[in-house]
Amino acid sequence: MGLFKKFKAPKVKIELKLDEVAYDYKDKLTGRIVLDPEEETSVNEFRLEFGGSKKVKWKKGFSSYSFTSSLETKKIPVGGQVKVQKGQHYEHPFQIDIPLYPKPDPFTEVEVKVKGVATVQGRPDLTHEAKPAINFPYVIECDRDYGGCGFMTQPLSEPVKTCPKCGNNLEEVWNREYSEEAREAARRPQRF
């Protein structure tokens, strides 16, 4: 292999094809990773990488807080080694459980991206990304830092507003939390 070939991805078209455009978090994510190589290529591994963003938008009276953060990347192997020839059409099917990215309150939205990856030793990975709509549940914590008891719910389709363990008003807990976050954000230096 030439020195410069190590820095270039193999000449292979890759596509992540999901069977559905929308899923519930309890569903199996099904589909296939499709390769159409323009050169002979040895794939070491097929995997799916889940990531994305979590967006918080809270407003109470004259106070508001918005924040976006990255979700933890979760890598799930879905297949092993395969050698594909130039001009050969190859499809690698998969069926996996969707990793859980729960929403902690009614002010948080989760957007997930799924990347199909084919790794080639010594060369850049082949990747293709899709953004399925995945309905994630609420997992609500009665946060001790803001006057709660620490109880955490099982996954729920709708957010609860009262802690099932201590009866604490969770809206008040969230308001304390996001009011404090908004004050801290206002104190931070602004970057332009």
Regions found by a protein language model. Give the residues of each.
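C-terminal beta-sandwich interaction modules and adjacent acidic
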Residues: 1-192
